[in-house]
Amino acid sequence: MNYQRLEKLGEGTYAHVYKGQNRVTGEIVALKVIRIDADEGTPSTAIREISLMKELRHPNIMSLSDVLQTENKLMLVFEYMEKDLKKYMDTYGNQGALPPSQVKNFTQQLLKGISFCHENRVLHRDLKPQNLLINSRGELKLADFGLARSIGIPVNTFSNEVVTLWYRAPDVLLGSRVYSTSIDIWSVGCIMAEMATGRPLFAGSNNEDQLLKIFRLLGTPTEQSWPGISLLPEYKPTFPIYKAQDLAYLFPTFDPLGLDLLRRMLRLQPELRTTGQDALQHAWFLTA
């Protein structure tokens, strides 16, 4: 084995992640060690992650440099990144909140990475601060493609058990099983808002609570504002009626252009949400 483990960085449902070193070159890397179950074989999440990450080469996507397999373990070798965005905010933020220039910089990098995924017909489906990694040069990269999916033509019927609850789009929460790149854009909007305040935008405790938190801020949708919403499995005609709040009041650090982009990403109706490419062309990124 050409790599030695230096320290444990974390663990997930099916893998442990270590800081490691290439014994030959001395390069510091991240090692994701996946247990292979004797009965079940390699987890489908690992197979998906490997196949997608081998194809997705971009400065804002974590690069997978090697895959090594033994009888009961699979080891993925990634470039080493110092912190995830959550830890970065906790370390350098003012009570977690980052300065406006940094929010803009990280939002732009995040949009570049996710737009590249979307151009290559891949949905990430699990964007959250813990899955965005930052290195010592301030480069932000998308990681953890274990839930990612290729977009089929026509749109596949995907499972609605995706994306950590707080970053989950309202259409997914309402049980829609036909969705596209717009679910990732919703997550980007939630992350952009969280970077500005240091707090998750919608920290719901369950599916319905999550929806009501969204409606409290953005207004309760109706059949008029979102045609077809009443047909979604989790829609209830008894949802409380909330009026949309003024985002400028909640996000005093955003200028009008920043607020405009945030609103475009957080449109309740998925078809009305901006795309990654359009978001990158937004005037907010053209101002200092």
Curated annotation (Swiss-Prot):
The gene is pef1. ATP binds at residues 9-17, 32. It is an enzyme of class 2 (transferase). The keyword ATP-binding applies. One of its GO terms (molecular function) is ATP binding. The modification Phosphothreonine is found at residue 13. Interacts with the pas1 cyclin. The modification Phosphotyrosine is found at residue 14. One of its GO terms (biological process) is signal transduction. Signal peptide: none annotated. Belongs to the protein kinase superfamily. CMGC Ser/Thr protein kinase family. CDC2/CDKX subfamily. One of its GO terms (cellular component) is cytoplasm. It catalyses: L-seryl-[protein] + ATP = O-phospho-L-seryl-[protein] + ADP + H(+); L-threonyl-[protein] + ATP = O-phospho-L-threonyl-[protein] + ADP + H(+). InterPro entries: CDK, Kinase-like_dom_sf, Prot_kinase_dom, Protein_kinase_ATP_BS, Ser/Thr_kinase_AS. Its EC number is 2.7.11.22. Keywords: ATP-binding, Kinase, Nucleotide-binding, Phosphoprotein, Serine/threonine-protein kinase, Transferase. SMART domains: S_TKc. The active site is at 126 (proton acceptor). Transmembrane segments: none annotated. It comes from the Eukaryota. It holds the Pfam family Pkinase. This is Serine/threonine-protein kinase pef1. The keyword Phosphoprotein applies. Residues 3-285 form the Protein kinase domain.
